[in-house]
Amino acid sequence: MSIDFKAKQSEFAAYIRDPDNNPAPPDVKAQRITMYRELFFNNIDNFLSSNFPVLRQILDDRQWFELAQDFFARHRCQSPYFSEIPEEFLAFLQNERANAGDFPFLLELAHYEWVEMALSIAKEDAIADQHQPENMLEQRLQVSPLAWPLAYRYPVHKIAPAFLPVEAPAEPTFLIVYRDLQDEVLFLEITPMTYRLLDILQQNDSVSAKDGLKQLAEESGHADPATIIAAGLQILETLHEKTIIRLAA
């Protein structure tokens, strides 16, 4: 009798992924398939643990195993590359994971940790202008591709075993995660107005710093736009020193 290889392969893979809900192939030794199962799962488990260290730290062993196993059993990765498993894990958390017992910030924390990994392996090089530009207000500026402005409901950069918020604060958290000239990934907490200013620069790289700050002042409804422009200039100078922004090409 011929063996349907694809059917046998599917049967084998189903058990490897989810042994609690799929029977082991009857013609494979239990010791052998258990070894394969542990090998596959441990590879995924170790990769997730190394890329989401804070998430791993705040979950006990049972919680972590259940989360990793749920991902391993149910998610169908679209990429064959190990380096893209963290992004696949994010897609799983956003679209497939449905566990009322999860921390409410779980997805945001995972995204924040993924950003650090993604920036660390990004192919772009950090580039700094040779000097602080004169009359920065008249310059066109752009946000570095290695600087990502982010907004979260939870203060994800503070989450730790000793700080596990159960409700989102009244105000969101705004961050820039960026890679510097030494290829170190850093973060900077910013104000909502700084976040909006960077958004303006990203939306239109032909706008000058002054025009961007004027737009910000108009949107804020501030009684003294000159104050916004002066404060904004100081912020831009700081961001430029950190290579978060640079002169537009």
Model-predicted segments: where are they?
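Basic amphipathic alpha-helical segments that dock to polyanions
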Residues: 231-243
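Short beta-strand "wing" residues that participate in macromolecule-binding interfaces
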Residues: 246-247
